UniProtKB/Swiss-Prot annotation:
GO molecular function, one term: structural constituent of ribosome
The gene coding this protein: rpsH
A Gene Ontology term for the protein's cellular component: ribosome
SUPFAM superfamilies referenced in this protein's UniProt entry, alphabetically: Ribosomal protein S8
Organism lineage: Bacteria, Pseudomonadati, Spirochaetota, Spirochaetia, Spirochaetales
Any GO BP: translation
UniProt-recorded name of the protein: Small ribosomal subunit protein uS8
Subunit: Part of the 30S ribosomal subunit. Contacts proteins S5 and S12.
Protein family (similarity comment): Belongs to the universal ribosomal protein uS8 family.
Job description of the protein: One of the primary rRNA binding proteins, it binds directly to 16S rRNA central domain where it helps coordinate assembly of the platform of the 30S subunit.
Source taxon at top rank: Bacteria
Key words of the record: Ribonucleoprotein, Ribosomal protein, RNA-binding, rRNA-binding
Species of provenance: Borrelia duttonii (strain Ly)
Length: 132
């Protein structure tokens, strides 16, 4: 079965791997997936990621981050926009996630950025996901 929503598939794989405390998870390579992982790495939700080929198909191996007691850094990761329901927001109406403790990932004209960066740059865009 073909995956029609690569971002949703990636978020589900990260959520499931985090809940069962896997060290890493293999994800399909795409530009938007890589941009989202850059933000997750910058914000400390994942340790790192590497790109590798499996039978000529590019994949990403994301190393998940845990605290000293093996509690996952990602408590919840949810897709906001889906292929059937795109959600957009202006920078003025950008929602806060967990009163500022979580992050919002936005696809804007400036690229894939956090909700805070979107507010600072005064750009709106498609709300991809929330993480906390």
């Amino acid at each position: 079965m073909a995956v029609t929503h690569s971002v949703g598939d990636m978020l589900t794989k990260i959520r499931n791997a985090s809940r069962v405390k896997h060290e890493s998870v293999d994800l399909k390579m795409s530009k938007i997936n890589r941009s989202i992982l850059d933000i997750l790495k910058e914000e400390g939700y994942i340790k790192n990621y590497n790109i590798f080929d499996k039978k000529g198909i590019p994949f990403i191996k994301a190393m998940l981050n845990y605290d000293g007691k093996r509690n996952p850094a990602i408590n919840r990761i949810d897709a906001i926009s889906t292929p059937g329901r795109k959600v957009y927001s202006s920078y003025k109406n950008m929602p806060r996630i967990k009163n500022g403790y979580g992050i919002l990932i936005v696809s804007s004209s400036k690229g894939v950025i956090t909700g805070k960066q979107a507010k600072d740059n005064k750009v709106g865009g498609e709300l991809i996901c929330s993480v906390w």
